[in-house]
């Protein structure tokens, strides 16, 4: 207000399945206490401003699509698969810039796709063998701790990656490779204009290199050429 700017509303990106039409979080594995809560209503009650919520990966996908349209000399990508790779894994799919939400807003959540490499690993969702248990920053840190390399948080893990610690770089690239092979199935089925990886791990070259190599290895050349 002091700067002469009026806040018109609040938008909140939530790390879990979201029914945006009803402004409710749906059984979030990492935030069980939020299940069924009308978050937008709670924000409005506290702040007196209109509010809306969206899944964080879906919001990231929309942001990437809109941002690229505003950049000169950059080809817009409006039909895309977006993967958020950070402490957890998330995903979204846009067609012509419109997020595909699916029944109840649950579309795009690739984190709990079962993958063979994760067989037997328990996931916070209650299942075993989910992608998130082998491709997220939390899972990388847990695996390194089991081998004697302990990092207190993911910020320390990423700092070690930037410092070029070989064991960390290897573990992060492996996670990127496993994620890439999973995403390759989606690319082959949906044939999007592009795949965008966001989240904290996307800033690590070893991770994105693993994703890219897996996509080229697992997808038809004709799809990758486009």
Predicted regions and their residues:
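ATP-binding/phosphotransfer module of carbohydrate and carboxylate kinases, centering on a glycine-rich
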Residues: 1-8, 21, 45-49, 68-77, ...
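Phosphate-binding/catalytic loop of phosphoryl-transfer enzymes
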Residues: 6-13, 17-133
């Amino acid at each position: 207000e002091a700067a002469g700017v009026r806040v018109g509303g609040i938008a909140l990106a939530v790390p879990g399945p979201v029914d945006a039409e009803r402004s409710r979080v749906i059984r979030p594995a990492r935030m069980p206490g939020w299940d069924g809560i009308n978050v937008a209503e709670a924000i409005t009650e506290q702040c007196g401003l209109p509010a809306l919520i969206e899944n964080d990966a879906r919001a990231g996908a929309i942001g990437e699509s809109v941002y690229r349209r505003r950049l000169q000399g950059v080809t817009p990508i409006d039909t895309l698969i977006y993967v958020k790779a950070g402490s957890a894994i998330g995903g979204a799919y846009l067609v012509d810039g419109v997020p595909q939400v699916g029944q109840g807003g649950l579309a795009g959540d690739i984190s709990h796709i079962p993958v063979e490499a994760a067989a037997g690993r328990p996931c916070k969702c209650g299942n075993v063998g989910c992608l998130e248990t082998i491709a997220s920053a939390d899972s990388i840190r847990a695996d390194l701790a089991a081998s004697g390399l302990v990092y207190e948080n993911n910020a320390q893990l990423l700092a070690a990656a930037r410092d070029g610690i070989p064991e960390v770089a290897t573990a992060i690239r492996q996670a990127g490779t496993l994620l890439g092979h999973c995403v390759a199935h989606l690319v082959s089925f949906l044939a999007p204009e592009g795949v965008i990886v966001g989240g904290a791990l996307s800033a690590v070259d070893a991770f994105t290199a693993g994703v890219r190599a897996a996509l080229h290895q697992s997808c038809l050349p004709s799809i990758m050429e486009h």
